Amino acid sequence: MAKTSMVAKQQKKQKFQVREYTRCERCGRPHSVYRKFKLCRICFRELAYKGQIPGVRKASW
């Protein structure tokens, strides 16, 4: 889990647009966040395996 202070800091409107960055909405992780789902890779994987993300299936070929 991310520090509460860092999550609060990120939610404030930034003075410059360049300073904004994505965070996982579930755990607050700042790295490897999928923009489309607003989830980090770890949370995405957990929810995908449980079938809680509509339209996502395990790949097989």
UniProtKB/Swiss-Prot annotation:
Record's cofactor remark: Binds 1 zinc ion per subunit.
Cofactors required: Zn(2+)
Binding-site residues for Zn(2+), renumbered to this chain: 24, 27, 40, 43
UniProt keyword terms in alphabetical order: Metal-binding, Ribonucleoprotein, Ribosomal protein, RNA-binding, rRNA-binding, Zinc
Superkingdom in the source lineage: Bacteria
GO biological process entries: translation
Pfam families: Ribosomal_S14 (PF00253)
InterPro entries: Ribosomal_uS14 (IPR001209), Ribosomal_uS14_bact (IPR023053), Ribosomal_uS14_CS (IPR018271), Ribosomal_uS14_sf (IPR043140)
GO MF annotations in UniProt: rRNA binding; structural constituent of ribosome; zinc ion binding
GO cellular component: a single term: small ribosomal subunit
Membership in a protein family: Belongs to the universal ribosomal protein uS14 family. Zinc-binding uS14 subfamily.
Binding partners and assembly: Part of the 30S ribosomal subunit. Contacts proteins S3 and S10.
Reported function: Binds 16S rRNA, required for the assembly of 30S particles and may also be responsible for determining the conformation of the 16S rRNA at the A site.
Protein name (database record): Small ribosomal subunit protein uS14B
Organism of origin: Staphylococcus saprophyticus subsp. saprophyticus (strain ATCC 15305 / DSM 20229 / NCIMB 8711 / NCTC 7292 / S-41)
